[in-house]
Every structure is written in C-alpha cells, then in structure tokens.
C-alpha cells in the first residue's frame, strides 16, 4: 500500500497534498476553515447538481419549479435548504478564513493570497447569481438593482447593462444566462482552489507565531485529518439545525413571493453576507463613487501586503494591532447591520461613519500602529 501511495502518478499527488504533507506542529483551529471551505464547496456542488435536475430557467416556471422541488421531489426541501444555508456557512467560513489571514499575516504568501482574493470575488458572483434563480421578489429586484450599478460606468455603462440583461430589463434572457453561469462557476472555483493549494504547498502553511516552522513539522495525516474532521462535525451541527428547524431564518421574506416587475419591495437588500459591502455602497451619495467604494471594499485586500509595515508577521505579540483588528471586525458587524436597515436618518450617518472607519483602519491606522510597535519593541 505504501508503494502505490508514493509511486502511483495520481495517488502520489493526493499523498503529498493530504497525507504526507509536512505541516507546522502548532497551527490552531483557525487553520481549520480552509478544509471546511472545501467541504462547503463539495456540498454546494452536489446539492446544486440535484437542484439543477428539477429546476427550469424560465421566468414563467422558475418559481413554481422551486416550489415543486420543495413539495414533490423526494427530500427536495432538504436539498434546497442545504444549498441555501450551505451558502451562508460557506461565507461564514470565508470571512473567518480571510480574517485569520489578516490576523496572522498569511498575506505575505502573495500568490496564495491573490488567488484567494480572486476566489472571493468568484464565490460572491456565484452566490449573487444563485440568489436570482428562484425568481422571487427579492431575486428579481436584487438582480435589477445590482446589475444596474454598472450603468454608473461612464460612456459604456448603459450599453453594458443591456448587454448583461440581454434586453431592456431583467427578463428570460437574464435568468437563463445567470443559471448557465451559476452552474459553471463552481467548477471554475474548484480549479482555482487547486491553484490556491498548489501555491500554498510551494511555501508551506503559515503558523500562529508567524515564524519559519521548517525545523518542526508533523505529517498532515493523522494529526490534522482528525482535527479537520472535528471541525467538519462542528460545522454540520449548526447547518443541520438551520435546515431542519428554521430554514428561512437567514433569507428575506420577500423572496417567498413570486417576482412582480410592477411592484417594488419597500426595502431591497441582499443576503446577509453581502450586507457589509451593500452598506458601503449606500453610504456614498454618488452612484459611481458608491460602485467604486463597493469594489474597493473587497479589492483593498490586495494592497494589504503593500501596507505591511510591521517587523513581525503575526499579530500574536502585537496588542495594539490586535485592538485595531477587533475594532475592524466590530465595524464589519456594524456595516452588516446597517446594510439591512432602511435608508433613514440615524442609519445613513452610522453607515457613513462605519464606512470611513473601515477604510481608514486598513489604509491608515493599522500601518501607523505597526510602525509604533516596531519602535516600542526597538526593532
């Protein structure tokens, strides 16, 4: 068995990636989320495939086909709600995974980090298009509002929006192409994940101390396989609780009524995992400015390696940077809350303050405090 594991052309790749991989001996549970994301992706592809077998991408039948899946297909409701709530778990793991990268300075592995940012954008695009497919009220109006943001691009904006819509409004053509993209993108994501892992295994994992761990490595299996399995069980628990006890808890109520192009819902809002970006978008009164802020709120991750002024890679021994990091987390919670609120007096101001804080923390406060810490530690 040892020979085939180490000599077979295909199995030896798996072996060097998941079995005999030398891993740092001290990586904490924050490193579990990579494998959990892999599990989420597998779940989404499997449940999505079964949903696609019964779904019809047509404006007249899309909504009723989803109803049919929930009512008439064997365990269709389980598959549908696993897929919907699996997306929430996917994003929860994604945000923690990115946060861990920020906290422990994993962004110095620049190729892995940049592929990760591309993955984040791709997953967000996939989730957005998936949200449109059931053709509920919020699906239709969400698609209309978000695609319409492209009209803010000077000169070509309007043509671009009509090109994406495949007409003069969100209609059958839009739904069909969104379904096509929503189906193909997870496979592109899988390919990108392989590239992500390829680059990661070139350098090896970072660790909580942020120091080279070459002298002290342990094999991935059995130590981290069993640890990842525990993480997976702890992820499945809340997911199953959501699916079986309150499957619509994280969804918008308006998505449960069929789309009506003639009546706009009072508050258009995306799923919870986009609310922070949506709040940043809404906090700027100018349309183009809002769109740029929205894109830059995620793209800012790409320039974080350039803003690294600290002599220590990890934040583990930098209490001031830790404080700023947790203020950033609290700020993202605030933005998420504001994104779900109506555009009224106190919320507008809070949203603008939180947006300014978000950018100033990353661009100004964190690099400055890192320099101060260097001085204090006499580095």
Swiss-Prot record:
The lineage of its organism: Eukaryota, Metazoa, Chordata, Craniata, Vertebrata. Gene3D superfamilies: Cytochrome Bc1 Complex, Chain C (1.20.810.10). The gene is MT-CYB. InterPro entries: Cyt_b/b6_C, Cyt_b/b6_C_sf, Cyt_b/b6_N, Cytb/b6-like_sf, Cytochrome_b, Cytochrome_b_C_euk/bac, Cytochrome_b_N_euk/bac, Di-haem_cyt_TM. A ubiquinone binds at residue 201. The chain crosses the membrane at residues 33-53, 77-98, 113-133, 178-198, 226-246, 288-308, 320-340, 347-367. This is Cytochrome b. Coiled coil: none annotated. The cytochrome bc1 complex contains 11 subunits: 3 respiratory subunits (MT-CYB, CYC1 and UQCRFS1), 2 core proteins (UQCRC1 and UQCRC2) and 6 low-molecular weight proteins (UQCRH/QCR6, UQCRB/QCR7, UQCRQ/QCR8, UQCR10/QCR9, UQCR11/QCR10 and a cleavage product of UQCRFS1). This cytochrome bc1 complex then forms a dimer. PROSITE patterns: CYTB_CTER (PS51003), CYTB_NTER (PS51002). It is found in: Mitochondrion inner membrane. Heme 1 (or BL or b562) is low-potential and absorbs at about 562 nm, and heme 2 (or BH or b566) is high-potential and absorbs at about 566 nm. It comes from the Eukaryota. It comes from Propithecus coquereli (Coquerel's sifaka). One of its GO terms (cellular component) is mitochondrial inner membrane. Heme b b566 binds at residues 97, 196.
């Amino acid at each position: 068995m040892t020979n085939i594991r180490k000599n077979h052309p295909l199995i030896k790749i798996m072996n060097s990636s998941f079995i005999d991989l030398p891993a740092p001996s001290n990586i904490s549970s924050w490193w579990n989320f990579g494998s959990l994301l892999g599990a989420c992706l597998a779940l989404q592809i499997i449940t999505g495939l079964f949903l696609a077998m019964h779904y019809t991408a047509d404006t007249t039948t899309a909504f009723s086909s989803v109803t049919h899946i929930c009512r008439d297909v064997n365990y269709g409701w389980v598959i549908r709600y696993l897929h919907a709530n699996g997306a929430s778990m996917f994003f929860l793991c994604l945000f923690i995974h990115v946060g861990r990268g920020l906290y422990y300075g994993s962004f110095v592995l620049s190729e892995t980090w940049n592929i990760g940012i591309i993955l984040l954008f791709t997953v967000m695009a996939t989730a957005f298009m998936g949200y449109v497919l059931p053709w509920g009220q919020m699906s239709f109006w969400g698609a209309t509002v978000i695609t319409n943001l492209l009209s803010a691009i000077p000169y070509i904006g309007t043509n671009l929006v009509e090109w994406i819509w495949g007409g003069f409004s969100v209609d059958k053509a839009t739904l069909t192409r969104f379904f096509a993209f929503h189906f193909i993108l997870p496979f592109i994501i899988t390919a990108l994940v392989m590239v992500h892992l390829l680059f990661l295994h070139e350098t090896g994992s970072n660790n909580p101390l942020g120091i080279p761990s070459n002298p002290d490595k342990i094999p991935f299996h059995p130590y981290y396989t069993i640890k990842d399995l525990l993480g997976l069980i702890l992820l499945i628990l809340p997911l199953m609780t959501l699916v079986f006890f309150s499957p619509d808890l994280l969804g918008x109520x308006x998505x449960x009524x069929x789309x009506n192009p003639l009546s706009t819902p009072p508050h258009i809002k995306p799923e919870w995992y986009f609310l922070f970006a949506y709040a940043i978008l809404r906090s700027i009164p100018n349309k183009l400015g809002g769109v740029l802020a929205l894109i830059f709120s995620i793209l800012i991750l790409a320039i974080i390696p350039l803003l690294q002024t600290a002599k220590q890679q990890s934040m583990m021994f930098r209490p001031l940077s830790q404080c700023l990091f947790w203020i950033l987390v609290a700020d993202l919670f605030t933005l998420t809350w504001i994104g779900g609120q109506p555009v009224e007096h106190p919320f507008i101001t809070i949203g603008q303050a939180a947006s300014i804080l978000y950018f100033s923390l990353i661009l100004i406060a964190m690099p400055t405090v890192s320099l101060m810490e260097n001085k204090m530690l006499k580095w």
